Amino acid sequence: MKRKVSLKIRKAHRYLGIFLGIQFLFWTISGFYFSWTNLDEIHGDHYKNLEYEPLSFENLISPSLIKIKESINSLEIRDINKKPYYFINKKWLYSARSGVRKNELTKNEALYIADKYMKKGLEVKSIEKITEVGKHHEYRKKLLPAYVISYKSDDNLKAYVSISDAKFQSVRHRSWRWFDFLWMTHTMDYEGRDNFNTITLRAFSLLGLITVLSGFTLAFVTTPKLMRFFKKN
């Protein structure tokens, strides 16, 4: 009877181990990578101009003079080619000197914005406008449309500037992409990569716990000394 129980537990433990083994391997590899990488480098700080200081502007008109239908709830100042603009209600750009609305950011203006935030000496390879991205894209969940600026680099370096708010958004490079891929395998969010509460992750975590417990149980039922010890106590 004990032998049958032992064989059943051993069989269950083996199949659970095979089923979960690949995911356990991904968890181990990704955890190892995360613990050995510098997050500042993953964020691309070594490609950024960390000494950048925004320009200060004078002789700006009062925002109340700008003719918009909505009341002003939020306001930020943007520097576009050394000219001040108001970004109002997280929707519109208006000149902070003339009050004229700016409808579109040009490629040259996007390059100017990126140049302020990126390290000096980088050579631009290309710039293109993107209007949509997939769930796994490196610019997912950020403001669109945007300009993606590619630099001549062995690291496949790219910078993103959103058009509607004239804002520098992010830097992407090869190490970040590896981190992003391993993060997906770690969280098991194969839909969008950013959800840490997926049903798949919960299920595999539970199965992993069952696998460990089955291993302890197997060790217990196959070790006579342990069984005798617990019977005595």
Q: What does each model-found stretch correspond to?
A:
Residues 1-233:
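Conserved histidines in hydrophobic membrane contexts and catalytic metal-binding motifs
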